[in-house]
Amino acid sequence: NCCLTGVLTCRWINSQHFPLSNLYESLLFLAWALTLIHLILEKLIPTNENIIGILFSPLPLLVSAFATFSLPEQMQTMSPLIPALKSNWLMMHVSIMMLSYAALLAGSLLSIVFLIVAKFKKEPISFESNTVNSLTYMLDQLSYRTLGVGFPLLTLGILSGAVWANEAWGSYWSWDPKETWALI
């Protein structure tokens, strides 16, 4: 996470704007957010289970590798912002959206692992017992809490995007494909 923080900080200093103006910077920020969520979840685990590290360690690496090796060079270069992006709403809207994507991705991954572990352990999925320290219970609680953070962040991100659109183009909603899919 320190290396990603350093890269994002250097791009911020060199470009004179928050590094979320293109796909490359957004993917690096997503990798940073995934690492942050990984570190937070590691602190929340009451046991010495290493499953969170096993699950989350490859994600930022894969996102960073995709951003670095798959995107064309012109998408990785810094460029001046267009006038519509020269707003403080850029930093708020895009960073909140990327944090929500990271939280929703993490929660979904935890839910998938919960289903896999519950199937292979062949234990009934019942949360009325006193087995609070079981792996399935821990995965369920972490996925629930992570998704519970992701959805409000997504809502806040969509609302801040609407306010930003009103400031930039004079309309909160324009039925743009990106906006329509955000609504869906």
Regions found by a protein language model. Name each.
Residues N1-I184:
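Polytopic transmembrane helical bundles with strong interfacial aromatic enrichment
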